[in-house]
Amino acid sequence: MIMRKLISLFAIAGLLFSIGCNKSSDATSGGPSTSSGAGGGKKLTIALMPKSKGNAYFISCKNGADKAAKELGVELLFDGPTDPDPAKQNEIVENWITLGVDAIAVACENKEGISTALRKAKAKGVKVITYDADSLPDAREFFVNQATPEGIGYALMDEASRLCGSEGEFAIITASLTAANMIEWQKHIEARRASKYPNMKMVALRPCDDLKDKAQSEATALLSANPNMKLIMAICSPAVPGAAEAVKQAGKTGKVKVIGLGLPNENRRYVKDGVTDSVILWKTEDLGYLTVQAAAALAKGTLKPGDKKVKAGALGEFEIQGDNILLGKPFVFNKDNIDQFDF
């Protein structure tokens, strides 16, 4: 279906139109899944967009999405900005509208910035859901919520306090100052700190542009500027190993704690070496899997507004609260359990 539409565009416009499926076929490419569906009829096309396609977090989500696409027999497009870029996300959504995909699922870098494009997709009959980071509610049908913002913020602050003895200075490294989901997490981190751990003090908030090297540079600067700092909290996945490497190179392993939201595989060495104390997350492959299952159900009409549960293949049923499909609670990975996971 997609290739016929592309060929038609080539013939009419004489343009070289490129989306992610024209790029390399490695884990970060926008290539479609090649699974063939069982049964006849129109094959659904689901388009999945990360915040940044080189981020290992979203590559792991894609692995789960690919599994769901294969099981369902749907075509999966995967494309997104190289670096977090709301304007580029809008451009990709516009391309997908032109291609006539059946459903779009987006991890939104900026909820206000992308909502107009998503509303346009809905008006054209495309089913729209968000995952990981939401748009404005009227721009989509459902949000696949990896965990509630409160649950994430509280888990991070509770772990920080436990490691610091409920007092001392800490800093946060985020992806960007405009990332909607991270802004929400920060609100709940601060609410938890103020209500339960008033002797903990946040001394800095630094963006790393979702890049490990920049996170390492920011962490190095934080260590220099804040000699009494007891902990660095990294709330985007590239920032956790970046902060850990900075602490290690500064010779402050054990003196400055490192925690954050990240993947076990990216942080295993630092956790086992005692540089990173804990990594908090959810099963990212399950997030990608659930997102594609939900998008397909929405496109088929088996998932409708007002439903209280959704079936998601091998993962079973998931609760829906309002228009939020809930993956589950955050999970803490540490040196005692990290070798049990491979993602």
Predicted ranges, named:
Residues 1-6, 65:
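Positively charged n-region of N-terminal signal peptides that target proteins for export
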Residues 21-343:
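A residue-level marker of the well-folded mature domains of exported/periplasmic proteins
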Residues 2-3, 10, 50-51:
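Short linear sequence motifs
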Residues 10-18:
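Bacterial N-terminal signal peptides
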Residues 8-10, 35:
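Short, intrinsically disordered, low-complexity terminal segments
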